[in-house]
Amino acid sequence: DVVTAPPHDGDFSSFKPDWSKYQVVVSNYDAPDARWSDSLKASFEEYVRNGGGFVAVHAADNAFPQWKEYNLMIGVGGWRGRNEKSGPHFYYQDGKLVPDQAPGMAGSHGARNPFKVVNRVTDHSITKGLPREWMHVGDELYANLRGPGENMTILSTTWSDPANRGTGHEEPMLMV
């Protein structure tokens, strides 16, 4: 079953999914905060709080920069005005997680290129059985993401190459 949000200029007043019908919501939603009503946000928060699964894919980290609970769900996000006030820029350096509080905007990516993904947590049910390192096909490598990062475990990272407008850090690629 698929629930699709109304188009860009569509009417969101009738968009009221029954989240409880789903074990997991997979989202690539990227639009301004104002489109979701407070009641729609509250129903989604309740769904997740009650154990509903939520997978934020690709541009879903751009959505809802002002929605505190959403940002707690995704851990880190980019664009749409996020900056140091949104939370630290999390990355790995010398094998350690760095919550960098330096000022700056959130969200960047270079040109689409293949990149190596490193699974840092190999005993998690999501990464168990996967190779420690593997190549991802050409794609945008999101970097410089910021957010509260509370209760966030970074399972995999990717080197954000400065030669491709990257940060020069091991950026989070897969988080739970």
Predicted regions and their residues:
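Solvent-exposed loop/turn segments at secondary-structure junctions
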Residues: 8-12, 30-35, 54, 60-64, ...
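Aromatic-Pro/Gly-enriched surface loop or interdomain linker
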Residues: 1-22
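A glycine-rich, often tryptophan-bearing local segment used as a flexible ligand/cofactor-contacting loop or short
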Residues: 34-125
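A generic local structural motif
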Residues: 11-14, 41-42, 140-142, 172-173
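Catalytic beta-strand/loop cores that center a nucleophilic Ser/Cys/Thr
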Residues: 89-176
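A conditional alpha-helix N-cap/helix-loop micro-motif detector
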Residues: 15, 34-37, 168
